């Protein structure tokens, strides 16, 4: 399958990534991506950016080198109540927010606690995507989370990076994907790139989705406008006109 969108990418601003914003945009353009999301880690990530970085996206272009740019954040869930490490004032300015659990920002809890964190964060209207929920460090009740995502119109990410960096993720990712297929929940495939050469490349996630027969209509990033329409329907991207 050809993917035209990558919403989960990091720059050197995240502290442990290796390429700049412009290098990422150039690579996205080179490989034919139509939409690129820059979603650096929230400020509670060691080495991550401060809030001024996220509050200053107004200086950034909307399009560059033929690529539509989404300026967002992979925000850290910092408690089981679903609080994020960026305030509402910042959240409402962003084009896209991925909410993720990272063990350097919150201790892994019980299955019930981890599930509660994800259920609660989906009550936040600014959250668009749940990041890498197949991480075995944070066991969850996958079906409860997937059903809640459908109710709240939140996208479930299938994170290609998890297949390599989070050992044991493949089985859980497949379970999550099958549940999304069963309940007709939209998914988005993300590279979680920390260097530009990973952008737009989802081989392991794509192979798994082919294996389970994931319907293409449930995959948001196989067309340019699906993600843009999704975000505009949530009241975002007011400055962007869709052709």
From Swiss-Prot:
Binding positions for Zn(2+) 3 per the UniProt entry: 74, 102, 132
List of residues binding Zn(2+) 2: 16, 41, 194
Molecular function via GO: phosphatase activity; zinc ion binding
SMART domains: POLIIIAc (SM00481)
Keywords, in A-Z order: Hydrolase, Metal-binding, Zinc
Cofactor: Zn(2+)
Residues annotated for Zn(2+) 1 binding in this entry: 8, 10, 74, 192
SUPFAM superfamilies linked: PHP domain-like
InterPro entries: Phosphatase_YcdX_put (IPR023710), PHP_dom (IPR004013), PHP_phosphatase (IPR050243), Pol/His_phosphatase_N (IPR003141), Pol/histidinol_Pase-like (IPR016195)
Coiled-coil boundaries: none
Superkingdom: Bacteria
Comment on bound cofactor: Binds 3 Zn(2+) ions per subunit.
The keyword Zinc appears for this protein: yes
GO cellular component: cytosol
E.C. number: 3.1.3.-
UniProt enzyme class: hydrolase
TM regions (residue ranges): none
PANTHER family membership: PHOSPHATASE YCDX-RELATED
Family: Belongs to the PHP family.
UniProt name for this protein: Probable phosphatase CLI_3563
Organism encoding this protein: Clostridium botulinum (strain Langeland / NCTC 10281 / Type F)
High-level lineage: Bacteria, Bacillati, Bacillota, Clostridia, Eubacteriales
């Amino acid at each position: 399958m050809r993917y035209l969108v990558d919403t989960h990418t990091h720059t050197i601003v995240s502290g442990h990534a290796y390429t700049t914003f412009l290098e990422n945009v150039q690579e996205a353009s080179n490989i034919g991506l139509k939409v690129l999301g820059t979603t650096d880690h929230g400020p509670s990530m060691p080495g991550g950016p401060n809030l001024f970085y996220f509050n200053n996206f107004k200086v950034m272009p909307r399009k560059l080198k033929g690529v539509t740019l989404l300026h967002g954040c992979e925000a850290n869930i910092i408690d089981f109540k679903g609080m994020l490490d960026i305030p509402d004032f910042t959240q409402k300015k962003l084009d896209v927010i991925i909410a993720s659990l990272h063990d350097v920002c919150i201790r892994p809890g019980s299955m019930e606690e981890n599930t509660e964190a994800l259920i609660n964060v989906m009550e936040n209207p600014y959250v668009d995507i749940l990041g890498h929920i197949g991480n075995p460090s944070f066991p969850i009740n996958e079906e409860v989370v997937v059903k809640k995502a459908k109710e709240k119109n939140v996208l479930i990410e299938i994170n290609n990076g998890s297949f390599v960096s989070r050992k044991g993720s493949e089985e859980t990712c497949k379970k999550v994907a099958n549940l999304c297929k069963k309940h007709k929940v939209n998914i988005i495939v993300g590279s979680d790139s920390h260097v530009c050469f990973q952008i737009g490349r989802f081989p392991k996630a794509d192979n798994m989705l082919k294996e389970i027969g994931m319907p293409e209509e449930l995959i948001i990033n196989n067309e340019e406008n699906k993600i843009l329409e999704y975000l505009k329907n949530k009241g975002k991207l007011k400055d962007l006109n869709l052709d």
